[in-house]
A protein has these predicted regions:
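A short, acidic, flexible beta-alpha connecting loop/helix-capping segment that sits on the rim
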Residues: 166-174
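A short helix->loop->beta-strand "cap" motif at the edges of active sites that frequently abuts
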Residues: 55, 158-162
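Gly/Pro-rich active-site loop or hairpin
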Residues: 31-39, 99-159, 175
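Acidic/histidine-rich catalytic cores of soluble enzymes
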Residues: 50-134
């Protein structure tokens, strides 16, 4: 990865803050238990990777459908990992909203707890509503007004507006005809 980043002069390397390996690749973004032990473990690994790569990582908060063994809130967990690992944050605003419904939390409070000086990029997207208590981050629907409102809140926290990506993987709306 380091050789690739150097060869192509890639200034930013981002990754999801999740488990993807348990003795073999899992090909999914599984939630990390939100514990002090996990904060230390993950932060130490991030610091090692940053040392090897010679640059800071940018970590993205993920959508989750279970919160195994949570000892702290997701906002506390993400903020503490970012702090201890001295890395940056790709704030996925739709994931904040999806998790707020799935885990009955306050998405506005989550964004307020994020270290604004470490927010490097933002994502927004649409999702699928399976039930009143379950949303799936699909990137296959229009962005809800509430997600746009959360994006505005995130922008208001920042001294400058960072690059923001609208993720849409399928169910594209028709293009307007000239």
């Amino acid at each position: 990865i380091k050789a690739f980043l150097q060869r192509y002069q890639v200034g930013t390397y981002s990754e999801h803050l999740s488990y993807t390996n348990d003795g073999g690749y899992l090909y999914d973004l599984l939630p990390i238990p939100m514990t002090e032990d996990a904060v230390r473990y993950v932060s130490e690994r991030i610091l090692r990777v940053q040392d090897i790569l010679g640059q800071k990582l940018v970590l993205e908060n993920v959508s989750t459908y279970l919160m195994p063994h949570a000892e702290m809130s997701e906002a506390e967990f993400v903020a503490e990992v970012i702090k201890q690992a001295d890395c940056e944050l790709l704030l996925d605003v739709n994931n904040v909203y999806v998790n707020s419904i799935n885990h009955d939390t306050n998405p506005y409070a989550f964004i307020e707890k994020m270290p604004s000086e470490r927010i490097r990029y933002l994502h927004i997207a649409g999702h699928e509503q399976v039930s009143n208590q379950l949303l799936i981050d699909t990137h296959g629907a229009a962005v809800l007004p509430t997600v746009w409102d959360l994006l505005e809140l995130a922008y208001a926290k920042l001294p400058t507006i960072p690059p923001t990506l609208l993720e849409r993987d399928f169910n594209f709306p028709p293009f307007a005809e000239p």
